[in-house]
Amino acid sequence: MDFSLSEEQTMLKEVARRFTANELMPLEKVLLEREMRMWTDGYTLLPEADHARLMKITQEMGFWGIEVDEKLGGQGLGMFAKTLVVEEMSKSLIGFSHHGFTLPPDAPNLYYLEECGSPAQRDKYVRRYCRGEIDSAMMATEPGAGSDISGLTTTAVRENGQWVINGSKIFISKCDKDELFFICIAVTDKEAPTKRRFTAFILDKDTPGLRIGAEIPVIGAMPTWSVYLDNVRVGDEAVLGEVGDAFIPLQNRFGVRRIELAAHCTGMAERLIQMMIDQANLRKTFGVALADRQTVQNWIADSTIELEQVRLQLYFTAWKSDQGHKDLRLEAASLKIAATEMLTRVADRAIQLHGGLGLSREMGIEYVARMVRIWRVVEGASEIHRMSIAKKLLTDGRTYSPFVAA
């Protein structure tokens, strides 16, 4: 087993590192200042001019569609290469936050389109998506159903050759974007088993009957909205995949997001550990350097151990994705738990080591702590993932070998 990076991957990682240092790090103060005023003054985390400039630079660098097939307008370098870039960018608050700056296209929804989209859907959406001309949002969560998808109540009923969709969704992102389409999950057969109950539909933002509701502020500067579906009528061309077959592709889509989240976590954890090292060597208490305090030494040692364990799991899971393993639900669930809980602990130690400074917005550590708290809930709560992992292992009736590459 070869753990070394290829020459191309090493170069990609270095280019991403320089981009992060030169373009993203200098904008951190702007992000932290605007984040305080998002909900009162209607700010985005980055000024539009800065966001447009970063988009132009990353497009010229070949960072758009890193993992996307070249036939669809991407770079064709795979999930592992994308992971290396996301990890480097996430050492900055700008790249760490999903609402700071992310590389187009949004990988999970793209994977869903690639896996299940018809030729017509790919022609209409995928290429524009890869070029950054259009964005997408997943529309699954409802007021009464989050991690437990079996509780969804939004329905799509066949009527006069069309699908009529009714229901409401909540905590939906990106609704402030003009050029947007949704992947909406709806119940098409209430009596069917969970895995055959749901169908995915592609809905353009301007589809009649689709209404964007109130904005819902949540911690970590993560804007979300309610969305209402009132007799939304679409044809069969809007069905993504097969009728009644959305459950497994949706779980695989979540798996891609969980790999991506883990890369955000490992990148930022590395940044925080370096901040802890710098502060420990700089600061003294009662005449003794923090670096000589055993508690501080333990914090830094434990953080390093935990980071490298998660990073190895992350790289292995991304590699398996590139090898064609489609069902990575178990790996992705385990990875998301490990990564988000690791960063939670590292951020807490970093705050504690920095004392009052750690609590200030100036350092940005408290922002990380708020963001990672969100990630232990979204894309499947940690408790649900633990339950799923245990259920899989306990009911399969086979020898324990969940992560062995076939």
Curated annotation (Swiss-Prot):
Inhibited by (S)-benzylsuccinyl-CoA. InterPro entries: Acyl-CoA_dehydrogenase, Acyl-CoA_Oxase/DH_mid-dom, Acyl-CoA_Oxase/DH_mid-dom_sf, AcylCo_DH-like_C, AcylCo_DH/oxidase_C, AcylCoA_DH/ox_N, AcylCoA_DH/ox_N_sf, AcylCoA_DH/oxidase_NM_dom_sf. The keyword Flavoprotein applies. It catalyses: (R)-2-benzylsuccinyl-CoA + oxidized [electron-transfer flavoprotein] + H(+) = (E)-2-benzylidenesuccinyl-CoA + reduced [electron-transfer flavoprotein]. One of its GO terms (molecular function) is acyl-CoA dehydrogenase activity. The keyword Oxidoreductase applies. PANTHER family: MEDIUM-CHAIN SPECIFIC ACYL-COA DEHYDROGENASE, MITOCHONDRIAL, MEDIUM-CHAIN SPECIFIC ACYL-COA DEHYDROGENASE, MITOCHONDRIAL-RELATED. This is (R)-benzylsuccinyl-CoA dehydrogenase. It comes from Thauera aromatica. The lineage of its organism: Bacteria, Pseudomonadati, Pseudomonadota, Betaproteobacteria, Rhodocyclales.
